[in-house]
Each structure stands twice: as structure tokens, then as C-alpha cells.
Amino acid sequence: MNSAVEAQLAELGIEGYLKQHQYKSLLRFLTCGSVDDGKSTLIGRLLHDSKQIYEDQLAAVHSDSQRVGTTGEKPDLALLVDGLQAEREQGITIDVAYRYFSTQKRKFIIADTPGHEQYTRNMATGASTCDLAVILVDARKGVLDQTRRHSFISNLLGLKHFVVAINKMDLVDYSQERFEEIRDEYLQFSENLAGETDIQIIPLSALEGDNVVEKGQNLSWFEGPSLLELLETVDVDHEKGEGDFRFPVQYVNRPNLDFRGFAGTISSGSVKVGDAIKALPSGKTSTVARIVTFDGDVQEAQAGLAVTLTLNDEIDISRGDLLVLENAQVESTNHLLADVVWMTEQPLQPGRDYDIKIAGKKTVGHVEAIRHQYDINNLSTHGAAELPLNGIGLCEWSLNESVALDNYQDCADTGGFIIIDRLTNVTVGAGMVKESLAAVERGLADVSAFELELNALVRKHFPHWEAKDLSQLLKK
């Protein structure tokens, strides 16, 4: 048991501690930056100084520091996070490492992402679930290409809060002049980032512990908060709840003949019993009869809550459909523009079919054209015939059916999708919807002979289904 938990248990008792812990807000954040900027050391210092390390973990770090550490006689706190043997031996981070800790004010999930360019896909994966990015800058080196790259990817993936931590201030004698020089350079670069971003820039030393949890005497000239104070006070819960109601249906829950509910997690906004809702892409409407949770029925539910909704009308809803408020303006389209992060050796090629999964909906799609590829070192763009591993580009997609979706910046759950290779079933890329384009009508040439024959058999043997004649429909 670590000392912080032990102290809280002594003060509150086990029931009081669990109750307090249950209602703490949760912040997911990632650390990113260039190679050897000290990301893993920073997380280790954060855990150590907030008393979140168990005694056996600390003993193991002391032991390993003698063998593979890089800090001389001091314990190498980066070893708390770099868990893979290859990472420890090379002194770098390869995979995305997750760590969990809590303070008296908040719970945290940390994603420690790799800094090397060839692991850009790992960093994008880590950023996709986070609310805030801690971007480390080496005080000796200043803003590097990788700093710009990770800032751009974090911005692309919808993160609105950035903490730029200028690390290794101990190696520049805690120079205020050097801090201000790097701060101005980063702020100038950040003008190119999309949307409204909240950027906080702080100096610190992860190795010595200055301004990580406590302010420290060496940075007395800095009047802002420490890193932990920033993380404890940033408001992300309000932002999640203020959007329009979006509820992707994950499962039709029918435990008996008397109950039919639609299970899922509310992506944004809120819903109340009695609200008029609309199912997309069908457009059929109803009203909410009950909101069922694990703890029983509630009258209202907000973003992030897993619920089962029952409706007053029996309308056709299945997995992959999207429930919104009746007056919501949501587009259903089979033609869209999206930023794509490519994650496999075989490049993305226009015209090739891929499985697309978006908010529980699975369909098939292909890239019509790659509008441009981003140079993520300077945010410029250039033409590209295909998208290579770790490449990011703006692509025009066509899907086999209409899908209800939002812009990714408005709602990540209903505006983000993954791209799956149809032969290997491997996830090969991730997409972020930028805008819906005019729907593409399928021509007769796009319909196979098998589909036409099946359509004719359905109309012949199941006339009560009232299926339309495909051959006649496509001639119009």
C-alpha cells in the first residue's frame, strides 16, 4: 500500500475512501515530445512525488537503476514506466504505456507515448482517448520537428488542452530568459493549429522534481502553477456534456418478451425521460420511456454514462444506428472528407476496399482520392498518390451505405472511424471526419449480377416485404 492511500484510509475509513474515490472526476492525458525529452522520467517523478509508488516498486527501481539506469547514483524514475525490456535497454519508449493514479482531487490515466518518428502511429493511438496533452520540450534544444509533429497530431485528434512543459531546466541553470525564448517560439508555431486550444506553458525539471508536484526554490521567478496543479484544475467534464445528444446503439437488449432496450454509451450531450428522439439513418421518431442503468432507472443521463434506453414506440433500431434529439441536424451520407493516419507498412491506395467501423456501425468503403498529404514537421501539404506508414493525409471516402456522422472536432465518437484490412482483419488506419460531401448515387454498374438476382428472388417469394425493384430504381 502506498503512503497516500494509507493516509486517506486512516482518515476516512474504507467506505469513506471508496465513496470519495467513486465521485472524483477523471482526466486522461498523454505525455509526448521528442526523443529523450524526459517523458517517462516526468511520469515517474509525478508518481513518486505524489506518493503513488508502492514500496516494492521503489525497491525494484533502485535495483534496476544500478543495472540499466541513466541517472548515476539516483534512482532512475523512468524505469517505473518503461516496462518492455527493449525500452529499458535502449533507454527509449516504444509502446504506449498506461499508468493510473489519483490525488485527493482527481483520478488520472496517463498515456506515455513514444517520441520516435517511426512510432507516430502509437502516439496517435494514445492521443485518441485523451483529454489533454503534456508536450515536453528539452530546454537545451527548444522546439523540434517532433514537438511540432506531436502538437499537430494531438490537435488533429481533437485535443483542446495543451500543457507545454519545458523540461531539463536544471541543465540551463533555470534560466528565465531561455524559458521565455522557447515559450515565444512555441506560441508562434501554435497559431497554425486548428480550432480553439487552451495552451499553458510551464518550466520544470523532472529529474530534480522542480515544479512537477511542488513549486521548488529554483523556479521562484515563475508565478504560474505546478504541473500537478494544472492537471487537477483543468475542466474537461463540462466540455463533454455541452454538445448535442449523440447515442450510438451498441446492442439491442432483449432479455425477455416484455423488454426491448437499446444499450450504449452517451457520446455527448444529455437525454431525459420524455425527450423526443430520432433514429438515424432511418429518420424514424419516438420518445424516451425509460433510462435504465446498472443502479436502476434515472430521469436524466449525461455524456459518458452507459445506459439502456427504452422507447414508447416499436421502431426498427439495430446496432450501429445513431439516436439523436428529434430536431437535431445530423447528416447521413456515403461520401465524406476525412483526415487519415496510416498505421501499416502497405500504403493506403485509392480504389481499394476496406472495412470501416464508425461508432458501432460497420460498412465497406474506399478512398476516391487523396487530396493531399501533410508534412507534419512544418504543417505544409503536398500531393500524394498513396499514403505511407505513419503518413497523415486528407482523403475523400465513398462508403457502400449512408452513415450518420458528425465532424470529428464536434464529437469524436461519431466523427472518428477505424480502417480494417478485409483480408487480414488488421486495423490499418484511423480517420477523423472533416466534412460530409454530397452523397454519391450508386449506378447500375456498381450493382453485381448476384445482387440483382437476389433482389428478384426476394420480391418473388416475399412480396409482403415490399422490396423495391433494384433494376428499375437504378435506371432513374
Swiss-Prot record:
Residues bound to GTP: 33-40, 112-116, 167-170
Chain residue ranges for the region called G1: 33-40
Subunit structure and binding partners: Heterodimer composed of CysD, the smaller subunit, and CysN.
EC number: 2.7.7.4
Segments of this protein annotated with the region G3: 112-115
Record's catalysed reaction(s): sulfate + ATP + H(+) = adenosine 5'-phosphosulfate + diphosphate
Key words of the record: ATP-binding, GTP-binding, Nucleotide-binding, Nucleotidyltransferase, Transferase
Region (G5): 205-207
Family annotation (InterPro entries): CysN_GTP-bd, CysN_II, CysN_NoDQ_III, EFTu-like_2, G_TR_CS, GTP-eEF1A_C, P-loop_NTPase, Small_GTP-bd
Free-text function comment from the UniProt entry: With CysD forms the ATP sulfurylase (ATPS) that catalyzes the adenylation of sulfate producing adenosine 5'-phosphosulfate (APS) and diphosphate, the first enzymatic step in sulfur assimilation pathway. APS synthesis involves the formation of a high-energy phosphoric-sulfuric acid anhydride bond driven by GTP hydrolysis by CysN coupled to ATP hydrolysis by CysD.
Annotated ranges, domain tr-type G: 24-239
Cross-referenced Pfam families: GTP-eEF1A_C, GTP_EFTU, GTP_EFTU_D2
Recorded superkingdom: Bacteria
Family: Belongs to the TRAFAC class translation factor GTPase superfamily. Classic translation factor GTPase family. CysN/NodQ subfamily.
Region (G4): 167-170
A Gene Ontology BP annotation from the UniProt entry: hydrogen sulfide biosynthetic process
Single GO MF annotation: GTPase activity
Protein name: Sulfate adenylyltransferase subunit 1
Pathway in which the depicted protein is active: Sulfur metabolism; hydrogen sulfide biosynthesis; sulfite from sulfate: step 1/3
Spans annotated as G2: 91-95
